[in-house]
């Protein structure tokens, strides 16, 4: 019984019970794989990257909770997490982080040298993000880089090169990530102010909704540029239009700046990523 309780706590620490983060990391990875392959990617590469997304996202959650272990107990949304509640010790958390990183690295060792080299940068970004909340009001920028680093890695693994379009896609993902993670930060803004945690939601203040809108628009413009540069099928743009409709819906949700609607807006971004993926996948398969 004790072992089951501990296993459940480890799963909660790694957020295996909350797949939204994995999905937000997975969609851009799939965008890159399908664009790099100009169709269906190599199956081995696809499986490695999907598994890598799951394990590295879990590792990111573990190190995030380790970094925030002295703050989470003072925040309503995070007070019952495994570390502040005493279910998982600091040593156990670091052990789980090391195990997840090791499994991810074993997976990436089956890729080419360029991909392996890029994975080291990805690990640094993933480990650095949680600590940025102490030093900058834009930890979301670092998160965007960490979440988007799978894009150049995907191009390296699938195509063996890093073309300009890979960095355009990386940029689009950073813009999108800052937008949706600011929505997420709006949920905790009051608590973060009390405990001294920095975030884009605090930095943007009363201009938060406008800046999120600008970031969302910039994401769409960058994705249009990518579609134009690759001469993607017109169906791609119809899916971008549907994604823009979801951005409008999110703006309505965050209008009140209340916790629940802001969190709902954040969760809605899963469908944005999915729509863009479908647009890319269908387009490249039709060409």
From Swiss-Prot:
Its main location: membrane. GO terms for biological process: ubiquinone biosynthetic process. Its EC number is 2.5.1.39. GO terms for molecular function: 4-hydroxybenzoate polyprenyltransferase activity. Coiled coil: none annotated. Its cofactor is Mg(2+). One of its GO terms (cellular component) is plasma membrane. Gene3D superfamilies: UbiA prenyltransferase. InterPro entries: HB_polyprenyltransferase-like, Prenyltransferase, UbiA_prenyltransferase, UbiA_prenylTrfase_CS, UbiA_sf. It is a multi-pass membrane protein. Keywords: Cell inner membrane, Cell membrane, Magnesium, Membrane, Transferase, Transmembrane, Transmembrane helix, Ubiquinone biosynthesis. Disulfide bonds: none annotated. Pathway: Cofactor biosynthesis; ubiquinone biosynthesis. It catalyses: all-trans-octaprenyl diphosphate + 4-hydroxybenzoate = 4-hydroxy-3-(all-trans-octaprenyl)benzoate + diphosphate. Belongs to the UbiA prenyltransferase family. Catalyzes the prenylation of para-hydroxybenzoate (PHB) with an all-trans polyprenyl group. Mediates the second step in the final reaction sequence of ubiquinone-8 (UQ-8) biosynthesis, which is the condensation of the polyisoprenoid side chain with PHB, generating the first membrane-bound Q intermediate 3-octaprenyl-4-hydroxybenzoate. This is 4-hydroxybenzoate octaprenyltransferase. It comes from Photobacterium profundum (strain SS9). The gene is ubiA.
């Amino acid at each position: 019984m004790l072992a089951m309780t501990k296993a459940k706590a480890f799963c909660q620490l790694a957020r295996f019970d909350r797949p939204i983060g994995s999905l937000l990391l997975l969609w851009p990875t799939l965008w890159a794989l399908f664009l790099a392959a100009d169709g269906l990617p190599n199956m081995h590469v696809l499986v490695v990257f999907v598994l890598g997304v799951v394990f590295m996202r879990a590792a990111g959650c573990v190190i995030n909770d380790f970094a925030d272990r002295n703050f989470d107990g003072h925040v309503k949304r995070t007070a019952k997490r495994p570390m502040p509640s005493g279910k998982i010790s600091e040593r156990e958390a670091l052990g789980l982080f090391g195990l997840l990183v090791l499994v991810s690295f074993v997976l990436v060792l089956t890729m080419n040298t360029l991909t392996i080299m890029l994975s080291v940068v990805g690990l640094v970004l993933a480990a650095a993000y949680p600590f940025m909340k102490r030093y900058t009001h834009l930890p979301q920028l670092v998160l965007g880089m960490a979440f988007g680093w799978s894009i150049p890695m995907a191009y390296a693994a699938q195509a063996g090169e890093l073309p300009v379009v890979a960095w355009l896609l990386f940029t689009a993902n950073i813009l999108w990530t800052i937008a949706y993670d600011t929505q997420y930060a709006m949920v905790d803004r009051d608590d973060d102010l009390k405990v001294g945690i920095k975030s884009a939601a605090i930095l943007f203040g009363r201009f938060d909704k406008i800046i999120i809108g600008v970031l969302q628009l910039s994401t769409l413009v960058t994705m249009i540029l990518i579609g134009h540069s690759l001469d993607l099928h017109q169906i791609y743009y119809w899916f971008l239009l549907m994604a823009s409709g979801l951005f409008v819906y999110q703006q309505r949700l965050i209008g009140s700046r209340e916790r629940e609607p802001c969190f709902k807006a954040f969760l809605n971004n899963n469908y944005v990523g999915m729509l863009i993926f479908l647009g890319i996948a269908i387009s490249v398969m039709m060409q």
